[in-house]
């Protein structure tokens, strides 16, 4: 504990990471009225600590007066940090809606979070969705954005401040969306393709979003996306359209799991059926527990996978054919059916193998009856 003007702070000069999870009854770090000073702190993550206040803000920045415990003459919630003293070296930060909105509305200096590269937003239950279009002004160097446990129906709206912020120095490279039970759309239709959250996007992970209707609007091009994983999104009927598929020239890894309503991975849009769709760099593809999946695509397009080496299929009982059109996979030599014991099947080509596996399952079902 420090003396003099800093007597109300406790210093941990070498602490680089602080993670607090599920401490529902903890109200303060120290029983007295003291905040922390951690000048070397790089990672600050606080989740599900409802009684704990993370930051104290300047009275000039707070529109509502703080609640006071009249018996002890002190705030009910003793903050961990003074916003003015938070480490300027933070690179990984988790924020709830209350703190995030105060920061966005001028609750701190603009240079407080200049070095933050990973921003984790959680429990935005009553927050206007427009926040997600403006956060980059306070966090200009964020390259990884995580949103979880919130009530958004649409994450990113089109137009307005979105386009202005597309000129920010850093663009989002990774977008992680977890446990967004009310989410219906990630991007609004006609969303600007040069927006900072789309332009350089390399990784997209969407987990436990059961009401998601559309993953990507067909108007968006994801030309830098290399990794796409979608798990437990039960409302998706298809993953992407053929127009979006054509933009995925850098995609290397595709994993789809536990999407029980999905009928096709690629849906035919207005593109001409005879046109080719080339996944130039796709090396790994996995379909797991897709109980309604009938095909990769039910159209006549030619699908070319010049780099595909591994294809894992498990728990897809309705998969009858890979594609109704031509499928070219020059380096694929087998379909992995069970990863744990490396069960691999292959007959002539990808379509023939899928057809043969479906026939065998049908024969097996008839014998069991």
Give the predicted meaning of each segment.
Residues 1-369:
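Cross-kingdom leucine-rich repeat
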């Amino acid at each position: 504990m420090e003396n003099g003007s800093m007597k109300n702070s406790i210093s941990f000069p070498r602490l680089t990471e602080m993670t607090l999870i599920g401490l529902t009854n903890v109200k303060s770090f120290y029983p007295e009225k003291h905040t922390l000073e951690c000048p070397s702190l790089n990672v600050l993550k606080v989740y599900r600590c409802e009684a704990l206040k993370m930051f104290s803000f300047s009275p000039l920045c707070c529109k509502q007066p703080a609640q006071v415990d009249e018996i002890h003459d002190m705030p009910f919630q003793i903050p961990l940090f003074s916003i003015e003293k938070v480490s300027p070296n933070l690179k990984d930060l988790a924020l709830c809606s209350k703190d995030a909105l105060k920061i966005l509305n001028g609750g701190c200096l603009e240079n407080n979070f200049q070095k933050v590269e990973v921003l984790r937003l959680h429990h935005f239950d009553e927050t206007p969705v427009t926040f997600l279009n403006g956060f980059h002004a306070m966090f200009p160097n964020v390259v990884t954005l995580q949103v979880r446990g919130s009530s958004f129906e649409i994450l990113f709206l089109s137009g307005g401040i979105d386009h202005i912020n597309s000129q920010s120095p850093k663009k989002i490279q990774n977008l992680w969306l977890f446990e967004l039970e009310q989410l219906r759309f990630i991007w609004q239709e006609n969303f600007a393709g040069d927006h900072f959250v789309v332009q350089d996007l390399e990784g997209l992970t969407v987990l436990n979003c059961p009401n998601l209707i559309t993953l990507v609007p067909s108007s968006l091009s994801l030309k830098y996306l290399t990794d796409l994983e979608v798990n437990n999104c039960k409302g998706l009927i298809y993953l992407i359209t053929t127009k979006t598929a054509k933009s995925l020239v850098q995609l290397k890894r595709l994993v789809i799991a536990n999407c029980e309503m999905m009928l096709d991975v690629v849906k035919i849009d207005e593109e001409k059926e005879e046109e080719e769709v080339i996944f130039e760099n796709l090396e790994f593809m996995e379909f797991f527990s897709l109980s309604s999946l009938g095909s990769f695509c039910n159209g006549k397009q030619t699908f070319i996978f010049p780099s595909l080496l591994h294809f894992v299929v498990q728990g897809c009982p309705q998969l009858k054919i890979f594609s109704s059109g031509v499928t070219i996979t020059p380096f694929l030599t087998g379909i992995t059916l069970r990863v744990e014991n490396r069960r691999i099947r292959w007959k002539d080509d990808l379509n023939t193998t899928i057809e043969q596996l479906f026939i065998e399952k049908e024969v097996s079902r008839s014998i069991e009856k």
